[in-house]
């Protein structure tokens, strides 16, 4: 069985399960594993027993933080599933998994429809062009509305859903689905508690009379959409002939793989209804590794030279390391997607990103945190490798004779930070180890040493992100430490252009001295477009020898780590080196580096420096009677209301609010709405801090 799959990639699906937090993603994954025979007992998220939530904190909090990889089989097809987190603080995990997937199942809450994080994850999937099917979950929930959810897929995502199923019954009476492809009803036992097969058995019945008209209407839309994919089908359609089930499925597959439509199915994973037809849809409609374009990379010697690697086991080996985890026995586990070629344990490969040779130890296919050893890793599959020394997320492993660098991943900068202080000298050593390991695993976790206070500062994507990292330091690395209050990661930038800023670095002490003269122009860049720094060399006629130019650049970049206003990192600066002078004996790389640092500080002081703060896109769902209080509160937090809409019995308010005003917001929101409102937030952009607020921040950081 497994051997066939290794050679026949049409029988492989690499998929992700993506959604908003609490839409039922992990429960859906658990059901998939149960029905495919990997699990003999269903693990419930609310019991803290699910297979893919294998870290202690995940089991306590009932949320998924790391994207565990699980392999299972359904109808002769191998499905490699990555269960991705829905919480906004863990977007890096989502981004990583989408980079290596071929398709995804987007899970929506049947009552809430498209929620903010569903939208974020959907846009991330758009970025990597990942074909998707939609599963409207929680159809048994009070207020669940399948048709409303389909409308939000159009309204909020701008996507084109293709409805393949209709729900039979709603809320407590939800018992099954109408299959519009084969025009039949699939009905599960009414009492799921008394069902000893846990939903594994269901009956095929006639479509209920009260749904017949609606089923015909949606079936007609489905057939019309499918007929447009092929001239022969279109002729058949216009001639009034019936399309066969095979023709309909082939048409849906073609449209899904091209991301032109998104098939929509429904069910209740918790009540064990609708999961098997969704698995059928994964096999029938989502792409195999052969359906997606060959992966692109570039030559090691020339970034402009594009190289492609087709999913073929006889081609040169190429794989992308997309995640690193620490295993209690094996140490570092490197999760990889093999794009081409194959390797066996003991093979030497090159880390093309770093130019270093590595020897692969053991190979595993993972089932959450259980590992199944394999004899070779082949194209189109996902594995965990051990024994690699110097590999980080986004590195390419490739054949030594045919190296290639695959497109890596870009990760957002952290927006929040806390100071962490070990309690004893022993804790200091443990903290260093913990930080190194955690930073290897998570590219959005950054660490710096505050030069003034000597404190270690850790940075992340949100309060929950940092909470969990600190928690892991305590549990896994036994670090006892005092943790400060969360602080906002401010930045500094400049608002106007300053020309011909000069600095002369001159030092004369016995023997050779130091000399470097530079003249520069500094101007603002558009940080909203991601332009953080640019260096241009316009020196002519050898006024500064070529070997000293990079030193000026390095000096500027060093000085940008701490801005002139309050010591926050400086961004959005274009630095142009115009002129300068050097001394045959006294000039050195160090002298020009110091001159670069000092000229930047001088230039920035004259370029109208300002403070920037992270703005969060906040969405609040509140009953109508609290709407006024919610809006008033957001305004008092310097928020700008962006929109107000209705959604299934509640009002949805979206606003841009500075992160600094949102600490403790959840408690205030609960008390203002008697615990009935919920909110979510995600990073939107950096914006200038109003002058009066900036003055307070600057005074505080200077200790005035």
Swiss-Prot record:
The keyword tRNA processing is annotated on this UniProt entry = no
- Which UniProt keywords are given for this protein, alphabetically ordered? Cytoplasm, Elongation factor, GTP-binding, Nucleotide-binding, Protein biosynthesis
Q: Write one Pfam family the protein is assigned to.
A: EFG_IV
Under SUPFAM superfamilies, the record lists:
EF-G C-terminal domain-like, P-loop containing nucleoside triphosphate hydrolases, Ribosomal protein S5 domain 2-like, Translation proteins
Designated name of the protein:
Elongation factor G
Residues annotated as binding GTP: 19-26, 83-87, 137-140
Q: Where is the protein found, in the record's own terms?
A: Cytoplasm
Q: Which HAMAP family match?
A: EF_G_EF_2_B
Describe its function: Catalyzes the GTP-dependent ribosomal translocation step during translation elongation. During this step, the ribosome changes from the pre-translocational (PRE) to the post-translocational (POST) state as the newly formed A-site-bound peptidyl-tRNA and P-site-bound deacylated tRNA move to the P and E sites, respectively. Catalyzes the coordinated movement of the two tRNA molecules, the mRNA and conformational changes in the ribosome.
Presence of the UniProt keyword Protein biosynthesis in the record? yes
GO CC, sorted alphabetically, is: cytoplasm
């Amino acid at each position: 069985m497994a051997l066939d799959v290794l050679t026949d990639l049409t029988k492989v699906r690499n998929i992700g399960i993506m959604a908003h937090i609490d839409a039922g993603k992990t429960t859906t994954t658990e059901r998939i594993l149960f029905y495919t025979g990997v699990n003999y007992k269903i693990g419930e998220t609310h019991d803290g027993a699910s297979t893919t939530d294998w870290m202690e904190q995940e089991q306590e909090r009932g949320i998924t933080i790391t994207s565990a990889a699980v392999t299972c089989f359904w109808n002769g097809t191998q499905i490699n599933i990555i269960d991705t987190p829905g919480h906004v603080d863990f977007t890096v995990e989502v981004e990583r998994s989408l980079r290596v997937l071929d398709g995804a199942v987007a899970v929506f809450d049947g009552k809430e429809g498209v929620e903010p994080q569903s939208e974020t994850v959907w846009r991330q999937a758009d970025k990597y062009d990942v074909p998707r099917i939609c599963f409207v979950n929680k159809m048994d929930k009070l207020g669940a509305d399948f048709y409303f959810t389909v409308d939000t897929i159009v309204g909020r995502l701008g996507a084109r859903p293709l409805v393949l199923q209709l729900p039979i019954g709603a809320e407590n009476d939800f018992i099954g689905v109408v299959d519009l492809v084969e025009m039949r009803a699939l009905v599960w036992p009414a009492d799921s508690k008394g069902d000893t097969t846990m939903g594994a058995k269901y009956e095929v019945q006639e479509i209920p009379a009260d749904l017949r008209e609606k089923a015909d209407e949606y079936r007609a839309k489905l057939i019309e959409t499918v007929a447009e994919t092929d001239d022969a089908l279109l002729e058949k359609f216009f001639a009034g002939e019936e399309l066969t089930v095979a023709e309909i499925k082939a048409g849906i597959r073609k449209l899904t793989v091209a991301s032109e439509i998104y098939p929509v199915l429904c069910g209740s994973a918790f009540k064990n209804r609708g999961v098997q037809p969704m698995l059928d849809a994964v096999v029938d409609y989502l792409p195999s590794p052969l359906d997606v374009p060959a992966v692109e990379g570039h030559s090691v010697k020339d970034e402009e030279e594009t190289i492609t690697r087709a999913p073929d086991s006889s081609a040169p080996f190429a794989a992308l390391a997309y995640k690193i985890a620490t295993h209690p026995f094996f140490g570092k586990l490197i999760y990889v997607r093999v794009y081409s070629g194959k390797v066996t344990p003991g093979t030497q490969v090159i880390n093309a990103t770093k130019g270093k040779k590595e020897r692969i130890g053991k190979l595993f296919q993972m089932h959450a945190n259980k590992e199944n050893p394999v004899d070779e890793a082949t194209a189109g599959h996902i594995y965990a490798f051990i024994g690699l020394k110097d590999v980080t997320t986004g590195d390419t492993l490739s054949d030594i004779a045919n190296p290639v660098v695959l497109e890596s991943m870009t990760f957002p900068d952290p927006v929040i930070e806390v100071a962490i202080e070990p309690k004893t000298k022993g804790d200091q050593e443990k903290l260093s180890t913990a930080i190194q390991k955690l930073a290897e695993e998570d590219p959005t976790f950054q660490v710096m040493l505050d030069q003034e206070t000597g404190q270690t500062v850790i940075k992340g994507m949100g309060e929950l992100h940092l909470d969990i990292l600190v928690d892991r330091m305590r549990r896994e690395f036994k670090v006892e430490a005092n943790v400060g209050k969360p602080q906002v990661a401010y930045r500094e930038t400049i608002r106007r252009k300053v020309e011909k800023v000069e600095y002369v670095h001159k030092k004369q002490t016995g023997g050779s001295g130091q000399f470097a003269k530079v003249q520069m122009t500094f101007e603002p860049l558009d940080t909203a477009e991601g332009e953080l720094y640019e260096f241009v060399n316009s020196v002519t006629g050898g006024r500064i020898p070529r070997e000293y130019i990079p030193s000026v650049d390095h000096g500027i970049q060093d000085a940008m780590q701490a801005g002139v206003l309050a010591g926050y990192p400086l961004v959005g600066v274009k630095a142009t080196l115009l002129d300068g002078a050097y001394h045959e004996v006294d000039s050195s790389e160090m002298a020009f580096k110091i001159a670069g640092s000092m000229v930047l500080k001088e230039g920035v002081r004259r370029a109208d420096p300002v403070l920037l703060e992270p703005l969060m896109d906040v969405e609040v769902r509140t009953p109508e009677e609290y709407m006024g209080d919610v809006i008033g509160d957001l305004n008092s937090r310097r928020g700008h209301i962006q929109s107000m809409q209705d959604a299934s019995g509640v009002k949805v308010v979206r606003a841009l609010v500075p992160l600094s005003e949102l600490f403790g917001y959840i408690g205030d929101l609960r008390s203002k709405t008697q615990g009935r409102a919920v909110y979510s937030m995600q990073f939107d952009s950096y914006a200038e801090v109003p002058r009066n607020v900036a003055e307070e921040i600057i005074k505080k950081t200077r200790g005035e």
